[in-house]
Amino acid sequence: MSAAKQCFRNLWRASNSVFEGDPMILAAARDKIRTGFHNHRCCSPEEAKKEIQNGNAVAEILRRNVVQAEKQSNDTYSLKIRKTTEINTNRQFTEKKFPR
């Protein structure tokens, strides 16, 4: 299978997983994937390789860093965290740093 087709499938599967249950966003993501591949159909091999790397990186970012949130009745949100979701402590953003 060609690298471009593998990248397309990788992005398609990532968007299906991440945007499951949200048909409007899933349709927009699919449209963006199709448009991106259509616009880069006739590019040089070097540019194609770069775009394939970018596409695979986007799929990985979607899987690891995008979560869906659903508003609950008590002004809180329920997050849909998947097995692939990256969970960090964000210590670098929560520690207060004061100049001396």
UniProtKB/Swiss-Prot annotation:
Gene Ontology CC annotation, any one: mitochondrial matrix
Coiled-coil annotation reads none
Which InterPro entries does this chain map to? Answer: Complex1_LYR_LYRM7, MZM1/LYRM7
Q: Which residues cross the membrane?
A: none
* Compartments where located: Mitochondrion matrix
Q: Which UniProt keywords apply?
A: Chaperone, Mitochondrion, Transit peptide
| GO MF | protein folding chaperone
Any one of the GO BP annotations: mitochondrial respiratory chain complex III assembly
The main place the protein resides is: mitochondrion
Per its database record, what is this protein's job?
Assembly factor required for Rieske Fe-S protein RIP1 incorporation into the cytochrome b-c1 (CIII) complex. Functions as a chaperone, binding to this subunit within the mitochondrial matrix and stabilizing it prior to its translocation and insertion into the late CIII dimeric intermediate within the mitochondrial inner membrane. Modulates the mitochondrial matrix zinc pool.
**Complex and partners:** Interacts with RIP1.
Concerning its family, UniProt says: Belongs to the complex I LYR family. MZM1 subfamily.
Name by which UniProt lists this protein: Mitochondrial zinc maintenance protein 1, mitochondrial
**Taxonomic classification:** Eukaryota, Fungi, Dikarya, Ascomycota, Taphrinomycotina
